[in-house]
Swiss-Prot record:
Keyword Cell membrane: no
Family the entry assigns: Belongs to the NAD synthetase family.
Xref: CDD domains: NAD_synthase
Lineage of origin: Bacteria, Pseudomonadati, Pseudomonadota, Gammaproteobacteria, Enterobacterales
Protein name: NH(3)-dependent NAD(+) synthetase
Source organism of this protein record: Shigella dysenteriae serotype 1 (strain Sd197)
Gene: nadE
One MF term in the entry's GO annotations: ATP binding
């Protein structure tokens, strides 16, 4: 088995999908989890205005709507959380995503004050954060807020990780990577677009250039610039297609060096890191 085949198998990626079937699969997955653990009353998700959180948010709300109708349990809710750092440049996209999702509840937590306070405390301890590390601080602050909300609403935190993100480890460890349940896992980027199109999402929300937008020195830096490959390259690779050798090498290097991000904390029983 080639490394490409191993990666595809590990991430559960498929060369083709039926959008309606995958929508139903994700909704039923969320519903089954909530029904298995009836003490869970809410799904909590940060909404950025990008493709992934828009899709995950819509699926969450659809799952909650169906469960309420089927069970009569009106205590169930989906909580969409806006988590800007100061003023977000694409705030209108966030509002458009909220309008599309129609969440039960919307909360806004501006993380800038908390991030600056943490940075100052570290500075006083003799640690000066780089712009890159400050970006990770933002991601972790966002997740901290979501877990606080989930804790106060008997909820779980929903993630947006998918195959095209997991393969490169393009998430912050214990930031956006630290979630309870990931309904998009298995899909690649273009497949996520297919689901949003089938759901009637405004096109500009899934045709915009993806960006983590964590760095102050390089605002709205496209993911593809950081990764050195395009999402079309990554999706082709995940679909088992032939890609240029340099593209395959870049993707595989990302996968291998970020293996630790896709695993629980390393113990004495782990040996993957010795390869």
């Amino acid at each position: 088995m080639t490394l490409q085949q191993q990666i595809i198998k590990a991430l559960g990626a498929k060369p083709q999908i039926n959008a309606e079937e995958e929508i139903r699969r994700s909704i039923d997955f969320l519903k089954s989890y909530l029904q298995t653990y009836p003490f869970i009353k809410s799904l909590v998700l940060g909404i950025s205005g990008g493709q992934d959180s828009t899709l995950a948010g819509k699926l969450c709300q659809m799952a909650i709507n169906e469960l309420r109708q089927e069970t009569g349990n009106e205590s169930l809710q989906f909580i969409a959380v806006r988590l800007p750092y100061g003023v977000q440049a694409d705030e209108q996209d966030c509002q458009d995503a909220i309008a599309f999702i129609q969440p039960d509840r919307v909360l806004t937590v501006n993380i800038k004050g908390a991030v600056l306070a943490s940075e100052q405390a570290l500075r006083e301890a003799g640690i000066e954060l780089s712009d890159f590390v400050r970006g990770n601080e933002k991601a972790r602050e966002r997740m901290k807020a979501q877990y606080s909300i989930a804790g106060m609403t008997s909820g779980v935190v929903v993630g947006t990780d998918h195959a095209a993100e997991a393969i490169t480890g393009f998430f912050t460890k214990y930031g956006d990577g630290g979630t309870d349940i990931n309904p998009l896992y298995r899909l690649n980027k273009r497949q996520g677009k297919q689901l949003l199109a089938a759901l009637g999402c405004p096109e500009h929300l899934y045709k915009k250039a993806p960006t983590a937008d964590l760095e102050d020195d390089r605002p709205s830096l496209p993911d593809e610039v950081v990764l050195g490959v395009t999402y079309d390259n990554i999706d082709d690779y995940l679909e088992g297609k032939n890609v240029p050798e340099q593209v395959a090498r870049t993707i595989e290097n990302w996968y291998l060096k970020t293996e630790h991000k896709r695993r629980p904390p390393i113990t004495v029983f782990d040996d993957f890191w010795k390869k």
